[in-house]
Amino acid sequence: MNNLITENQNLNIKDQICEIEIKNTIVFNKNNINNNNNNNSNSSIKKCLKSSFNESINENNILTFEIQPNGTYKNYFSNEIPNEIQHLIVEEELYKQFIVKINNKRLPIYYQIMLILMILSMILIIPLFFIVFTFSPRLAFGICLTLLFYIAIFILTNGLIEKRIVLILTYFVLYKKKNYKIEEIILNYNSFLINKKIPILFRLIYKENHVVPGFDKISIEVTFINE
């Protein structure tokens, strides 16, 4: 917890409530600043935050969060973290490094293999149907239904239904686009799936809060301003 990596920074954003010091444990420690300036603004935010977290804040007025990417890349921040704190975090250099690291990280090899096998199975089922259909329509339907059943079992048993279609699209379509920020992917796909009438299978695939194995996380310690 010692050995500061950077000096304390005052963030120039609206409703400033704290300063951030980054430590080598990759912890954001938020401390009080601007006791003499913007007291009204600080006080209003503090009361809002503390009213939501009274049960979670410890005796030192500190609340700890974790940031870890989930299967959709929907959001790195859980719902408990208010926007005021999120805005402070995303301005920090260490958070930006964390995003870059996640962007450059690949899925574990066994997940890559499962995704490829699932996609190939879904593609091959179409020509297979027409080939067998020329000989026996009943057999063609039977084989295709059986394959669809096994694909469904494959998805369920290997957790791919919790990986969601967004994960597949992110890695196979957008992975190589270096300038495409991960936050834009989060917002765009989240908005798309909410606003569209998604079939039941895809709504199941878009299941929330499944953490992808092998990905890093960082911790955040928020020290609230005293009354």
Curated annotation (Swiss-Prot):
It comes from the Eukaryota. The chain crosses the membrane at residues 113-133, 141-161. It is a multi-pass membrane protein. It is found in: Membrane. GO terms for cellular component: membrane. Keywords: Membrane, Transmembrane, Transmembrane helix. Its main location: membrane. This is Putative uncharacterized transmembrane protein DDB_G0285229.
